């Protein structure tokens, strides 16, 4: 029997489903937000203040990229006060997330149920979180006692090591290299691409697969859109909030994958489950699958077979 290998990828939608207000919009509307409309310290603060007033969905990292991108018509030279303010912004986000993760969680949330099933399954030896929160603390609050390992992709608030910023393929104006995530002193390499390549099954929960993080997943989705045999297909389950986010996610996949959506869907066991008004049949099938395809079930089957042979 081939060794099973499963991967869990966690995005901010996971923490939001727990009941925490961890979106950038939530941060921008909190008392921790260091941006002020009047008396801005630097052009970066002024730019963020303008954007927060006009954009319904406030994607902080995309706005940082937009501000520092090469070719903007104003502020061509890096302002010396921008970097200290960026550090202040990052520290403020750290304090905000810390106070959010100190709150209780919704123990009946889909996020908790999925985490319990994943940990109990036993084959998820690769768990990655793009969030800054403590997954062990979440597990304890959820009543999960089994041991598991996971990796932070962008640091964590517990170690004051969060990484915010922009991708490495966007050309930035001179002097704004500090905004690149891969340039952060806290950045650590990880084998996420290899784990995705080698796994039989992957579960995404609450990750938008947006272009800022898409380089982590680009090779995986490209490969799964060019399967040459049935055995190359994988089980891919994506948990997202609602139908609006489902369509956004599919559109993002289509754009980033050169329009190769049909092969991706047909050559893999791809399911998208919405956490608001979910398809209960689809949800139950997911949980039943993880229970059936688990280390415990396989051990029970082997023990049963051994007893029959004696």
Language-model-detected regions and their locations in the chain:
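Conserved catalytic-core helix/loop/strand module for nucleotide-ribose chemistry
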Residues: 2-8, 12-201, 207-310
């Amino acid at each position: 029997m081939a060794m099973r290998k499963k991967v869990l990828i966690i995005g901010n939608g996971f923490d939001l489903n727990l009941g925490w207000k961890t979106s950038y919009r939530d941060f921008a509307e909190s008392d921790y937000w260091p941006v002020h409309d009047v008396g801005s310290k630097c052009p970066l603060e002024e730019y963020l203040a303008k954007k927060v007033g006009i954009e319904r969905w406030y994607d902080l990292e995309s706005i940082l990229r937009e501000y520092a991108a090469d070719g903007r018509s104003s502020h061509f030279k890096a302002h010396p006060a921008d970097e200290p303010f960026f550090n202040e912004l990052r520290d403020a986000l750290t304090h905000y997330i810390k106070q959010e993760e100190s709150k209780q969680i919704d123990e009946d949330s889909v996020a908790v149920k999925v985490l319990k099933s994943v940990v109990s399954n036993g084959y998820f030896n690769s768990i990655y979180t793009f969030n800054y929160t403590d997954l062990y603390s979440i597990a304890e609050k959820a009543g999960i006692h089994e041991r598991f390992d996971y990796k932070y992709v962008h640091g964590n608030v517990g170690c004051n090591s969060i990484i915010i910023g922009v991708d490495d393929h966007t050309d930035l104006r001179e002097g704004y290299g500090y905004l690149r995530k891969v340039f952060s002193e806290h950045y650590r390499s990880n084998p996420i691409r290899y784990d995705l390549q080698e796994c039989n099954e992957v579960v995404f929960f609450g990750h938008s697969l947006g272009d800022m993080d898409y380089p982590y997943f680009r090779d995986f989705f490209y490969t799964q859109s060019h399967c040459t045999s049935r055995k190359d297909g994988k089980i891919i389950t994506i948990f997202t909030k609602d139908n609006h986010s489902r369509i956004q996610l599919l559109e993002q996949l289509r754009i980033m994958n050169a329009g190769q959506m049909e092969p991706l869907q047909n050559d893999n066991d791809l399911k998208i489950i919405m956490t608001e008004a979910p398809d209960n049949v689809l949800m139950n099938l997911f949980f039943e699958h993880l229970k059936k395809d688990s280390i415990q079930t396989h051990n029970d089957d082997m023990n049963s077979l051994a007893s029959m042979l004696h």
